[in-house]
């Protein structure tokens, strides 16, 4: 049975977006289909529609990633926020985040991705999730599971408020310790078991690294054993403490080229839904999947500042969770979204594209790769993703070396 959510439709220049609860999906439809569903007119339809359905021209992001706190006791070596036991200066409280949720709801955002730090430590997390539901947004949660019985029991008590809860498990047993720098797998597993008893909408977030890539089969087998809904794989980013550990933990070119066939094989074997974060799109295009199919599956590259936005614990707006803040707070997104130069290089990917991206058939989908990786490696966020297999092959063929920024040692 197909069921729409309370925020069932949002007008866009190309037509609109239908938000479904069953099956869970955001469905992009053209103006004719929207009219047939009863949506008659919008100021966004005054101009002729873009024949390419350019999603870079959305009226608002689809989702917002809110770092509710930068407090976390774990101390993971690659933490992309650089979280600490004391958190960050100027962190917002519940009232400020409610104001942000109001602004995002007014803009027509569909989903919230709530995280940290470790947001399960916040006594008001459940209130924030409930408020998002009241305002018509679907809150989702990422959690480490590395906290005490009291916090876990509290989270399980309102777990059904979330559309999806993903526990961060970057490997099984020794692979977990290899990525995180300590052995916390048993505690994370304990959280998975408890949360799965509270709700069926539980999955895994897995950051893939050089040392854990070969252990992906164990991650999928674990997810199947625990009857989880999905496995989401994330590329390791040079952000937070990950800046210092990036060279040691990032995957090799061989691993990046093997990612898609490996994941497809494991997904079929274990009959699990798998998601790849947007920074992996260059590794998908390497296998020359038809662009029309990628568009139909909504596989896009760097979505920061367009399909999604982020916010730091202080409320400062970011293009994505891994990017530095811009000169606006998230509760001011209504004005900033339409402003000239908003999100800088995250929106300039088309006009700034250099070869081989400029002539690549996948540019409109890949968008030049991950801006955060590119900025860290080359010093230029608009340059082609230096780890894209197609970029690496082109540079090898043309005798072009990848520009690399000198590391900053602190």
Show which residues each predicted segment covers.
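Short, acidic, Ser/Thr-enriched surface-loop or helix-capping motifs
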Residues: 311-312
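Short Fe-S-cluster ligation motifs
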Residues: 103-116, 383-410
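Iron-sulfur (Fe-S) cluster-binding segments and ferredoxin-like electron-carrier domains
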Residues: 81-90, 324-327, 363-398
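N-terminal pre-core extensions flanking Radical SAM catalytic domains
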Residues: 1-86, 105, 405-409
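Short, small/polar residue-rich loop motifs at catalytic or cofactor-binding pockets
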Residues: 302-306
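C-terminal accessory region of radical SAM enzymes
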Residues: 253-291, 316-368, 377
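Short, basic/aromatic recognition patches
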Residues: 290-300
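Radical SAM/AdoMet-radical enzyme domain recognition
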Residues: 89, 94-116, 121-252
